[in-house]
Amino acid sequence: MAEERSQRNRDRSREEKIDDGMIEKLVAVNRVSKTVKGGRQFTFTALTIVGNGEGSVGFGYGKAREVPVAIQKSMEYARKTMANVSLNNGTLWHPVKANHGAACVFMKPASEGTGVIAGGAMRAVLEAVGVKDVLAKAIGSRNPINLVRATLKGLEDMQSPTHIALKRGKNVRGFSHGS
């Protein structure tokens, strides 16, 4: 009982579903200090994900002197930079590996009912884009910004069998696993 409640509270604090149908997730907030003649100046950075849960997702990184302003800036930027991703009934079309900097992500499709098995920043991206079943692993750096960028790069590089068949000028039936 207590575990369920703590799980609900954790999810509620990190995710908001806004009236326009967008899912907004706060991935990380960081305090940065700059030492000047008069002492230290503190600023805050925020990393956020915005998605519609149906294959569209974007991320934003905002900086400001106050946390709410940094979050607001990053949300606005995330909405401006949204990209579309092709999904296969709530999972991926094929296994994907992508890098950004020293962060490397590996994602593969999972059978229905598996859920999102991913950590941290990857989980936020996958849930916002609308993936329901996936197995994912972060290798190398766990820097949230690089993990988000690598995850998005992998999702954008993923192609449906129909798209590949059109590019090659072949029939989709020729792409089955048995042939």
From Swiss-Prot:
PANTHER family per UniProt: MITOCHONDRIAL RIBOSOMAL PROTEIN S5
GO CC, any one term: small ribosomal subunit
Species, as recorded: Xylella fastidiosa (strain 9a5c)
HAMAP family: Ribosomal_uS5_B
Protein task: With S4 and S12 plays an important role in translational accuracy. Located at the back of the 30S subunit body where it stabilizes the conformation of the head with respect to the body.
Segments forming domain S5 DRBM: 22-85
Annotated keywords: Ribonucleoprotein, Ribosomal protein, RNA-binding, rRNA-binding
Record family assignment: Belongs to the universal ribosomal protein uS5 family.
Name of the gene this protein is made from: rpsE
Name listed for the protein in its UniProt record: Small ribosomal subunit protein uS5
InterPro entries: Ribosomal_Su5_D2-typ_SF, Ribosomal_uS5, Ribosomal_uS5_bac-type, Ribosomal_uS5_C, Ribosomal_uS5_N, Ribosomal_uS5_N_CS, Ribsml_uS5_D2-typ_fold_subgr
Biological process per Gene Ontology, one example term: translation
Gene Ontology MF: a single term: structural constituent of ribosome
Superkingdom to which the source organism belongs: Bacteria
Keyword Phosphoprotein applies: no
SUPFAM superfamilies found in the cross-reference section: dsRNA-binding domain-like, Ribosomal protein S5 domain 2-like
Entry domain remark: The N-terminal domain interacts with the head of the 30S subunit; the C-terminal domain interacts with the body and contacts protein S4. The interaction surface between S4 and S5 is involved in control of translational fidelity.
Known partners and oligomeric status: Part of the 30S ribosomal subunit. Contacts proteins S4 and S8.
